[in-house]
Amino acid sequence: MTRRSIYFLPLALMALLGVGASADDDNRPLRIRNAPEFDGVTRWINSKPLTMKALKGKVVVVHFWTNGCFNCVNNYEHYRAWQERYADKDVVIIGIHSPETASEHDIARIEKQAEKHKLKFPIAVDNETRNWEAWKNKVWPTVYVVDRRGVVRYGWEGELNFKGQKGEETVRKVIDSLLAETTAKGTR
């Protein structure tokens, strides 16, 4: 076997198995199947404590963010729009604030950020990052869409519309699709 073959063989195997990224990837960071329970939440803002079990039967949009992340701030308008658009539907928007730095553990600062940017949806303060770890999250911001059975069906890493990407539109279509899917099956 030549040196060239040693390098080529693993790449060929990956191609055969469909492993790797392609230009058609639509940003699906799914590392889990079932949505984990909210665990170790330091405090809930804008809501009483929520559980994934109690949210079964609803489409749940979970987004991870932190105060010091400008990409997270750029996503706020989309979260607010979804909150308004789906207010009369079985959709729940939940923010999970998982800090990156020591200063981001400050609950008063998180509340101030939520008030300043009119974030009215439930926010779980994840100061111990137990939810971050349970969801196997990697970057801020990340958005997950969970179906009515509690199965994570879609995920988007990073700013939704960064450099012309269509993340907001894609996530919205996933939400609409899940609402139509469950309505068509009569499982509202």
Q: What are these model-derived regions, one by one?
A:
Residues 1-9:
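Bacterial N-terminal signal peptides that target proteins for export
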Residues 50-73, 93:
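Short active-site neighborhood of thiol/selenol oxidoreductases, capturing the structured segment around
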Residues 118-122, 136-144:
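Structural micro-motif
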Residues 23-52:
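N-terminal "domain-start" segment that seeds a small globular fold
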Residues 73-117, 127-134:
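Structural microenvironment flanking redox-active thiols in thiol-disulfide oxidoreductases
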